[in-house]
């Protein structure tokens, strides 16, 4: 159905954005004199997850993590089919987010 497809795409997009912004916050850009601290990086991850849950949570539940999806499957909160598609979308979203960050980041910044 359309709602199921939207939910799967929502998981893909949320995971892509979470990985992109989270990992992007840990890069050492030349304009930042000191390297990002653990607190700054964790704040970026926290703000990213909070924002994504608020914006996409009503569509799919915003699991954004295969471990959360598997836990929901074990707890009988989602069907096996939904969990399978969610995990696949999350894995693809994570790879796509990292690949996008890799392509958009200058080579000397990547480390």
Swiss-Prot record:
Q: Which domain of life is it from?
A: Eukaryota
Q: Enumerate the Extracellular topological stretches.
A: 28-37, 105-111
Which GO-annotated molecular functions does the record name? water channel activity
| Intramembrane stretches (start-end) | 62-71
| Annotated transmembrane regions | 7-27, 38-56, 83-104
Assigned GO CC terms: apical plasma membrane; basolateral plasma membrane; cytoplasmic vesicle membrane; Golgi apparatus; plasma membrane
Query: Which cellular compartments is it found in?
Result: Apical cell membrane; Basolateral cell membrane; Cell membrane; Cytoplasmic vesicle membrane
Q: What does the record give as the reaction this protein catalyses? A: H2O(in) = H2O(out); glycerol(in) = glycerol(out)
Q: How is it modified after translation?
A: Serine phosphorylation is necessary and sufficient for expression at the apical membrane. Endocytosis is not phosphorylation-dependent.
User: For side Cytoplasmic, which residue ranges?
Assistant: 1-6, 57-61, 72-82
UniProt xrefs under SUPFAM superfamilies:
Aquaporin-like
Q: Where is this motif: NPA 1?
A: 65-67
A biological-process GO annotation: water transport
Provide the membrane topology annotation.
Multi-pass membrane protein
Fetch the Pfam families from UniProt. Answer: MIP
* Keywords from the UniProt entry: Cell membrane, Cytoplasmic vesicle, Glycoprotein, Golgi apparatus, Membrane, Phosphoprotein, Transmembrane, Transmembrane helix, Transport
Q: Subunit structure, per the record?
A: Homotetramer.
Biological function: Forms a water-specific channel that provides the plasma membranes of renal collecting duct with high permeability to water, thereby permitting water to move in the direction of an osmotic gradient. Plays an essential role in renal water homeostasis. Could also be permeable to glycerol.
The family annotation for this protein states: Belongs to the MIP/aquaporin (TC 1.A.8) family.
The record's note on its domains: Aquaporins contain two tandem repeats each containing three membrane-spanning domains and a pore-forming loop with the signature motif Asn-Pro-Ala (NPA).
Could you identify this protein by its name? Aquaporin-2
Query: Which organism encodes this protein?
Result: Macroscelides proboscideus
């Amino acid at each position: 159905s359309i709602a199921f497809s939207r939910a799967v795409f929502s998981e893909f997009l949320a995971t892509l954005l979470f990985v992109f912004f989270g990992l992007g916050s840990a890069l050492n850009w030349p304009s930042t004199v000191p390297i990002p601290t653990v607190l700054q990086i964790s704040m970026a991850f926290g703000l990213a997850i909070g924002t994504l849950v608020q914006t996409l949570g009503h569509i799919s539940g915003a699991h954004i993590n295969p471990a959360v999806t598997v836990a929901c499957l074990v707890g009988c909160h989602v069907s096996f089919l939904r969990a399978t598609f969610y995990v696949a979308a999350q894995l693809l979203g994570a790879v796509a987010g990292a690949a996008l960050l890799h392509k958009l980041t200058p080579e000397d910044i990547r480390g």
